[in-house]
Regions:
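Domain-level signal for soluble alpha/beta catalytic cores
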Residues: 1-316
Protein backbone atom coordinates (compact mmCIF):
# COMPACT_ATOMS: atom_id res chain seq x y z
CA UNK A 1 0.00 0.00 0.00
CA UNK A 2 1.41 3.36 -1.02
CA UNK A 3 1.61 6.18 1.49
CA UNK A 4 1.62 9.53 -0.27
CA UNK A 5 2.60 12.53 1.84
CA UNK A 6 0.15 15.13 0.55
CA UNK A 7 -2.44 13.24 -1.50
CA UNK A 8 -5.19 13.87 1.03
CA UNK A 9 -4.19 17.44 1.93
CA UNK A 10 -2.62 19.33 -0.95
CA UNK A 11 -0.82 22.27 0.66
CA UNK A 12 -1.14 24.52 -2.40
CA UNK A 13 -4.88 24.73 -1.68
CA UNK A 14 -4.03 27.10 1.16
CA UNK A 15 -2.62 30.62 1.14
CA UNK A 16 1.08 29.79 0.70
CA UNK A 17 2.77 30.52 -2.63
CA UNK A 18 4.08 27.53 -4.59
CA UNK A 19 6.46 27.69 -7.52
CA UNK A 20 6.78 25.13 -10.29
CA UNK A 21 9.48 24.68 -12.89
CA UNK A 22 9.62 26.54 -16.19
CA UNK A 23 9.53 25.20 -19.73
CA UNK A 24 11.24 21.85 -19.25
CA UNK A 25 11.40 20.79 -22.86
CA UNK A 26 12.45 24.15 -24.29
CA UNK A 27 15.13 24.49 -21.60
CA UNK A 28 16.54 21.03 -22.27
CA UNK A 29 16.52 21.55 -26.04
CA UNK A 30 17.65 25.16 -26.42
CA UNK A 31 19.75 25.76 -23.30
CA UNK A 32 21.17 22.31 -22.59
CA UNK A 33 21.43 21.13 -26.20
CA UNK A 34 19.61 17.87 -25.52
CA UNK A 35 17.47 16.56 -28.39
CA UNK A 36 13.96 15.48 -27.38
CA UNK A 37 12.13 13.60 -30.13
CA UNK A 38 8.42 14.45 -29.95
CA UNK A 39 9.16 16.73 -26.97
CA UNK A 40 9.37 13.56 -24.84
CA UNK A 41 11.52 14.38 -21.81
CA UNK A 42 10.70 11.04 -20.19
CA UNK A 43 12.91 9.36 -22.79
CA UNK A 44 15.93 10.78 -20.93
CA UNK A 45 15.21 8.35 -18.09
CA UNK A 46 16.67 5.48 -20.08
CA UNK A 47 20.27 6.71 -19.58
CA UNK A 48 22.31 7.80 -16.58
CA UNK A 49 23.29 11.00 -18.39
CA UNK A 50 19.64 11.76 -19.08
CA UNK A 51 18.65 11.14 -15.47
CA UNK A 52 21.45 13.44 -14.31
CA UNK A 53 20.25 16.18 -16.68
CA UNK A 54 16.70 15.94 -15.39
CA UNK A 55 17.77 15.89 -11.75
CA UNK A 56 19.98 18.95 -12.27
CA UNK A 57 17.07 20.69 -13.99
CA UNK A 58 14.66 20.07 -11.11
CA UNK A 59 17.14 20.85 -8.35
CA UNK A 60 17.72 24.33 -9.80
CA UNK A 61 14.06 25.18 -9.18
CA UNK A 62 13.98 23.59 -5.75
CA UNK A 63 16.88 25.78 -4.70
CA UNK A 64 15.02 28.87 -5.92
CA UNK A 65 11.98 27.84 -3.88
CA UNK A 66 14.11 27.33 -0.78
CA UNK A 67 15.88 30.66 -1.25
CA UNK A 68 12.52 32.41 -1.63
CA UNK A 69 10.82 30.56 1.21
CA UNK A 70 8.00 29.26 -0.99
CA UNK A 71 6.71 25.77 -1.68
CA UNK A 72 7.15 24.01 -5.00
CA UNK A 73 5.13 21.58 -7.10
CA UNK A 74 7.45 19.26 -9.02
CA UNK A 75 5.84 17.95 -12.20
CA UNK A 76 7.25 14.67 -13.50
CA UNK A 77 8.86 14.49 -16.94
CA UNK A 78 5.92 12.46 -18.25
CA UNK A 79 3.92 14.91 -20.36
CA UNK A 80 4.45 12.63 -23.37
CA UNK A 81 4.42 9.30 -21.48
CA UNK A 82 1.05 8.07 -22.75
CA UNK A 83 0.51 5.19 -25.13
CA UNK A 84 0.19 7.00 -28.48
CA UNK A 85 3.31 9.10 -27.94
CA UNK A 86 5.23 6.29 -26.27
CA UNK A 87 4.65 3.99 -29.24
CA UNK A 88 6.26 6.57 -31.52
CA UNK A 89 9.42 6.15 -29.43
CA UNK A 90 9.27 2.37 -29.22
CA UNK A 91 7.79 2.05 -25.73
CA UNK A 92 5.25 -0.63 -24.91
CA UNK A 93 2.85 -0.36 -21.96
CA UNK A 94 5.27 -1.90 -19.47
CA UNK A 95 8.17 0.32 -20.52
CA UNK A 96 5.95 3.40 -20.21
CA UNK A 97 4.83 2.38 -16.74
CA UNK A 98 8.43 1.78 -15.70
CA UNK A 99 9.48 5.21 -17.00
CA UNK A 100 6.58 6.85 -15.20
CA UNK A 101 7.50 5.20 -11.90
CA UNK A 102 11.14 6.11 -12.37
CA UNK A 103 10.22 9.75 -13.00
CA UNK A 104 8.17 9.92 -9.80
CA UNK A 105 10.88 8.08 -7.88
CA UNK A 106 13.47 10.68 -8.87
CA UNK A 107 11.23 13.49 -7.61
CA UNK A 108 10.65 11.67 -4.34
CA UNK A 109 14.41 11.44 -3.85
CA UNK A 110 14.71 15.19 -4.47
CA UNK A 111 11.98 15.84 -1.90
CA UNK A 112 13.74 13.67 0.67
CA UNK A 113 16.91 15.70 0.18
CA UNK A 114 15.58 19.24 -0.10
CA UNK A 115 12.19 19.63 1.60
CA UNK A 116 11.98 21.94 4.61
CA UNK A 117 9.03 23.22 6.68
CA UNK A 118 9.21 26.51 4.76
CA UNK A 119 9.42 24.74 1.39
CA UNK A 120 6.97 21.86 1.14
CA UNK A 121 7.49 19.87 -2.06
CA UNK A 122 4.45 18.40 -3.80
CA UNK A 123 5.04 15.57 -6.28
CA UNK A 124 2.72 15.68 -9.29
CA UNK A 125 2.42 13.30 -12.22
CA UNK A 126 2.28 15.31 -15.45
CA UNK A 127 -0.18 14.29 -18.16
CA UNK A 128 -0.22 15.67 -21.68
CA UNK A 129 -2.88 15.70 -24.38
CA UNK A 130 -3.35 12.66 -26.56
CA UNK A 131 -2.94 14.79 -29.66
CA UNK A 132 -1.21 18.04 -30.53
CA UNK A 133 -1.24 20.48 -27.64
CA UNK A 134 -1.78 23.41 -29.97
CA UNK A 135 -4.54 22.04 -32.22
CA UNK A 136 -7.91 20.56 -31.29
CA UNK A 137 -7.78 17.91 -34.00
CA UNK A 138 -9.42 14.50 -33.58
CA UNK A 139 -11.53 15.03 -30.47
CA UNK A 140 -12.27 12.18 -28.10
CA UNK A 141 -15.48 11.81 -26.18
CA UNK A 142 -15.16 12.08 -22.38
CA UNK A 143 -15.42 8.28 -22.15
CA UNK A 144 -12.69 7.76 -24.74
CA UNK A 145 -10.46 10.28 -22.95
CA UNK A 146 -11.09 8.58 -19.62
CA UNK A 147 -10.12 5.20 -21.01
CA UNK A 148 -7.03 6.53 -22.82
CA UNK A 149 -5.58 8.43 -19.87
CA UNK A 150 -6.62 5.99 -17.14
CA UNK A 151 -3.56 3.77 -17.63
CA UNK A 152 -1.11 6.59 -16.93
CA UNK A 153 -3.16 7.93 -14.02
CA UNK A 154 -3.42 4.46 -12.47
CA UNK A 155 0.37 4.23 -12.64
CA UNK A 156 0.71 7.57 -10.85
CA UNK A 157 -1.79 6.41 -8.23
CA UNK A 158 0.31 3.29 -7.58
CA UNK A 159 3.30 5.47 -6.62
CA UNK A 160 3.77 7.98 -3.80
CA UNK A 161 2.89 10.88 -6.09
CA UNK A 162 0.61 13.36 -4.36
CA UNK A 163 -1.49 14.22 -7.39
CA UNK A 164 -1.70 14.29 -11.17
CA UNK A 165 -1.94 17.34 -13.42
CA UNK A 166 -2.93 17.52 -17.08
CA UNK A 167 -1.36 20.29 -19.16
CA UNK A 168 -1.96 21.96 -22.53
CA UNK A 169 -5.49 20.63 -22.91
CA UNK A 170 -7.28 22.28 -25.80
CA UNK A 171 -10.83 20.97 -25.66
CA UNK A 172 -13.15 20.22 -22.79
CA UNK A 173 -14.03 16.56 -23.43
CA UNK A 174 -10.45 15.47 -22.82
CA UNK A 175 -10.41 17.35 -19.53
CA UNK A 176 -13.67 15.72 -18.43
CA UNK A 177 -12.28 12.27 -19.23
CA UNK A 178 -9.03 12.89 -17.35
CA UNK A 179 -10.92 14.05 -14.26
CA UNK A 180 -13.12 10.95 -14.45
CA UNK A 181 -10.07 8.69 -14.68
CA UNK A 182 -8.44 10.39 -11.69
CA UNK A 183 -11.65 10.19 -9.70
CA UNK A 184 -11.91 6.45 -10.37
CA UNK A 185 -8.64 5.90 -8.47
CA UNK A 186 -9.16 8.69 -5.89
CA UNK A 187 -6.22 10.68 -7.26
CA UNK A 188 -6.30 14.47 -6.89
CA UNK A 189 -5.96 16.14 -10.28
CA UNK A 190 -5.40 19.64 -11.62
CA UNK A 191 -6.53 20.60 -15.11
CA UNK A 192 -4.62 23.14 -17.19
CA UNK A 193 -6.08 24.54 -20.39
CA UNK A 194 -4.06 26.26 -23.07
CA UNK A 195 -5.40 29.39 -24.73
CA UNK A 196 -4.94 31.17 -28.03
CA UNK A 197 -4.13 34.86 -28.43
CA UNK A 198 -7.87 35.65 -28.16
CA UNK A 199 -8.10 33.98 -24.74
CA UNK A 200 -10.12 31.01 -26.03
CA UNK A 201 -9.17 27.36 -26.17
CA UNK A 202 -7.94 26.15 -29.59
CA UNK A 203 -11.35 24.44 -29.86
CA UNK A 204 -13.01 27.86 -29.73
CA UNK A 205 -14.51 27.33 -26.28
CA UNK A 206 -14.16 30.06 -23.70
CA UNK A 207 -12.19 29.38 -20.55
CA UNK A 208 -15.33 29.90 -18.49
CA UNK A 209 -17.20 27.32 -20.57
CA UNK A 210 -14.36 24.81 -20.24
CA UNK A 211 -14.05 25.12 -16.47
CA UNK A 212 -17.77 25.22 -15.75
CA UNK A 213 -18.57 22.27 -18.00
CA UNK A 214 -15.72 20.17 -16.61
CA UNK A 215 -16.90 20.89 -13.07
CA UNK A 216 -20.50 20.17 -14.00
CA UNK A 217 -19.66 16.81 -15.59
CA UNK A 218 -17.42 15.72 -12.69
CA UNK A 219 -19.19 17.15 -9.63
CA UNK A 220 -16.32 19.60 -9.22
CA UNK A 221 -13.78 16.81 -8.57
CA UNK A 222 -10.74 18.63 -10.00
CA UNK A 223 -8.60 20.06 -7.21
CA UNK A 224 -8.12 23.25 -9.21
CA UNK A 225 -7.57 24.63 -12.69
CA UNK A 226 -4.60 26.25 -14.38
CA UNK A 227 -3.70 28.07 -17.58
CA UNK A 228 -0.52 27.10 -19.43
CA UNK A 229 1.31 27.65 -22.71
CA UNK A 230 -0.09 31.13 -23.31
CA UNK A 231 1.21 34.61 -22.54
CA UNK A 232 -0.60 36.78 -19.95
CA UNK A 233 -1.41 39.34 -22.64
CA UNK A 234 -3.41 36.63 -24.43
CA UNK A 235 -5.79 35.92 -21.57
CA UNK A 236 -5.71 38.76 -19.05
CA UNK A 237 -8.89 40.24 -20.51
CA UNK A 238 -10.92 37.08 -19.81
CA UNK A 239 -10.05 37.29 -16.10
CA UNK A 240 -11.26 40.84 -15.55
CA UNK A 241 -14.98 40.29 -14.95
CA UNK A 242 -14.69 38.89 -11.43
CA UNK A 243 -17.04 35.93 -12.00
CA UNK A 244 -17.21 33.11 -9.41
CA UNK A 245 -15.56 30.55 -11.74
CA UNK A 246 -12.28 32.46 -11.44
CA UNK A 247 -12.07 31.12 -7.88
CA UNK A 248 -11.30 27.70 -9.42
CA UNK A 249 -8.07 28.91 -11.05
CA UNK A 250 -5.06 28.42 -8.78
CA UNK A 251 -2.19 28.10 -11.21
CA UNK A 252 -0.55 29.88 -14.14
CA UNK A 253 2.28 28.48 -16.26
CA UNK A 254 2.70 31.13 -18.93
CA UNK A 255 4.95 31.27 -21.96
CA UNK A 256 7.81 33.74 -22.02
CA UNK A 257 6.87 34.72 -25.56
CA UNK A 258 3.91 36.68 -26.84
CA UNK A 259 3.98 34.57 -30.00
CA UNK A 260 0.91 32.60 -31.02
CA UNK A 261 0.91 28.81 -30.98
CA UNK A 262 1.29 28.79 -34.77
CA UNK A 263 4.28 31.13 -34.57
CA UNK A 264 5.88 29.05 -31.81
CA UNK A 265 5.39 25.87 -33.84
CA UNK A 266 7.14 27.41 -36.85
CA UNK A 267 9.96 29.05 -34.88
CA UNK A 268 13.51 27.70 -34.96
CA UNK A 269 14.66 29.97 -32.14
CA UNK A 270 13.71 30.43 -28.50
CA UNK A 271 11.96 33.63 -27.48
CA UNK A 272 12.75 33.96 -23.77
CA UNK A 273 11.10 37.35 -23.38
CA UNK A 274 12.06 39.36 -20.28
CA UNK A 275 11.92 37.60 -16.88
CA UNK A 276 11.30 40.78 -14.88
CA UNK A 277 8.45 41.86 -17.13
CA UNK A 278 6.82 38.44 -16.90
CA UNK A 279 7.17 38.54 -13.12
CA UNK A 280 5.38 41.90 -13.05
CA UNK A 281 2.63 40.47 -15.24
CA UNK A 282 2.13 37.64 -12.75
CA UNK A 283 1.74 40.19 -9.97
CA UNK A 284 -1.03 41.82 -12.03
CA UNK A 285 -2.68 38.43 -12.57
CA UNK A 286 -2.79 37.85 -8.83
CA UNK A 287 -5.03 40.91 -8.52
CA UNK A 288 -7.47 39.21 -10.92
CA UNK A 289 -7.23 35.67 -9.54
CA UNK A 290 -7.96 35.65 -5.80
CA UNK A 291 -6.94 32.00 -5.39
CA UNK A 292 -3.70 32.09 -7.41
CA UNK A 293 -1.15 30.06 -5.45
CA UNK A 294 0.86 28.10 -8.06
CA UNK A 295 3.21 30.04 -10.33
CA UNK A 296 5.47 28.57 -12.97
CA UNK A 297 6.35 28.73 -16.62
CA UNK A 298 5.93 27.01 -19.94
CA UNK A 299 7.64 27.46 -23.31
CA UNK A 300 10.69 29.72 -23.22
CA UNK A 301 10.77 30.18 -19.45
CA UNK A 302 13.64 29.03 -17.25
CA UNK A 303 14.90 29.50 -13.70
CA UNK A 304 15.29 33.26 -14.20
CA UNK A 305 11.60 33.69 -14.94
CA UNK A 306 10.52 31.58 -11.96
CA UNK A 307 12.80 33.52 -9.63
CA UNK A 308 11.30 36.79 -10.92
CA UNK A 309 7.75 35.48 -10.53
CA UNK A 310 8.33 34.45 -6.93
CA UNK A 311 9.89 37.79 -6.05
CA UNK A 312 7.06 39.72 -7.69
CA UNK A 313 4.29 37.66 -6.10
CA UNK A 314 5.86 37.78 -2.65
CA UNK A 315 5.99 41.57 -2.93
CA UNK A 316 2.35 41.80 -4.03
Amino acid sequence: MQSSKYRHRLPQLGQKLFATDGGMETTLIFHDGIPLPHFAAFDLLRSEAGIAALRSYFERYVRIARDQGVGIVLESATWRASSDWGSKLGYDAQALADATRKSIGMLLEIRDEFETPATPIVISGAIGPRGDGYVAGARMSPTEARDYHRVQIETFASTDADMAAAFTLNYVEEAIGIVAAARSVAMPVAISFTLETDGRLPSGETLAEAILRTDQESDGYAAYYMINCAHPTHFRHVLQQGEPWLQRIRGIRANASRRSHAELNDSADLDAGDPQTLGAEYRELRDLLPKLSVAGGCCGTDHRHIDAMCRALKAA
